[in-house]
Amino acid sequence: MKVVHISSSGKLDGGAELCLVDLIKYEIENGINPYVLLPYKGELQEKLNSMGVETDIIHYLPWRHHRSEPKLKSSAIFLIKIVINLIQEVHIYHFLRKHRVDLVHINTTAVYAGSISAHILNIPLIWHLREFNGQPTSYDFYCKSFSYWLLSNASKCIAVSKVIDNFYSEHLNNSIVIYDSMEEPRHERQSDLFSTDITRIILIGNKKPDKGQMDAIKALSQLRDLPIHLTLIGKDLDEAYVAEMHDYTQKHSLANLLTDNSFDSEAKYKLLESDIALNCSRSESFGRTTVEALMSGCLVIGNNNSCTAELLANGRGLLYEGSEDLSVKIRWAINHPAESKDIAKKGAEFGVGSFQTGNKNIVNLFKSML
């Protein structure tokens, strides 16, 4: 079975790309021959090539735009991208014919590359729904009618959460919910939750406004009477936002309570050293770091929205609304260690029990399309 995966990025610092690598590993282990098309060179291609996966660079462009973009500018860019993408689609068409591909898988909704070629060649198309488009997020499709027509004509769409499935239900009736597979921590925790002198809090996510790191920093300023330390891990993707974070930290004398690190490929192992993990994102279609935190046995406190609320429902974590409420939840957790441990245990059982079969289910879906 030959499967072509189409990635919207050449980077390897996002959940979509990490999940794609995990899926391809599973495919190789189960006798499937994967190929991957990428829009540009980068760490993802290097990783795939090291795994023996054949890749090709075809310079297709996204079909989404920032919603704040002026309408005239957006329309002009859309027309230019249509021309470029049609040219690149010809290259994809020839690639699919040359390799006699059995199935095409588009890994995100950020691109539509390959969808037209798959339709013309009558090749089954599976499309992953990993992102919100339109409200409440900052991005949307250039042309919604065209976008939803292509999505609705896919053989099947895979929603990564119930929240995402509900979001697209108005436009699509060909979707199925399959949670991404997640790997259990390879190491065990070295100490019980809340057993050390300092409560260790961690937030993993690239630093930009929609990831909400300011919620955590503002909450920290209201908890200086407690022995706590906050670690932020993630790339600085928004200079103005990072500057705001640093200014607030200095103004409120929080530097000794805060460690700010860049992206770390081993970040998930730092979860095993943490008591509380935060997800302050404004909107999560899935929440890979949330699941990793649950699996690692942390007490997870998340923003009460989207898939974060889905994952932490039924007593699997704590939910907050606003930085002041976040500080209240953190204080409660520290002052109630026994109850916090019970919540973390329930979350860990859910994490380990619910995210082990995703890749198997996806591959079974692929096979059912042939």
Label for each model-derived stretch:
Residues 338-368:
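A charged, aromatic-enriched C-terminal amphipathic alpha-helix characteristic of glycosyltransferases
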Residues 14-22, 199, 208-222, 243:
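A conserved mid-protein helix/loop that constitutes part of the nucleotide-sugar donor-binding site
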Residues 282:
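Aromatic "clamp/platform" in nucleotide-sugar-dependent glycosyltransferases that forms part
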Residues 314-324, 332-338:
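Conserved acidic donor-binding segment of nucleotide-sugar-dependent glycosyltransferases
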Residues 37-43, 204, 229-243:
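Glycosyltransferase donor-sugar binding loop
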Residues 242-263:
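Nucleotide-activated donor-binding/catalytic signature segment of Leloir-type glycosyltransferases, i.e.
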Residues 163, 181:
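Carbohydrate-associated surface elements
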Residues 299-302:
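Short hydrophobic beta-strand element within catalytic cores of glycosyltransferases
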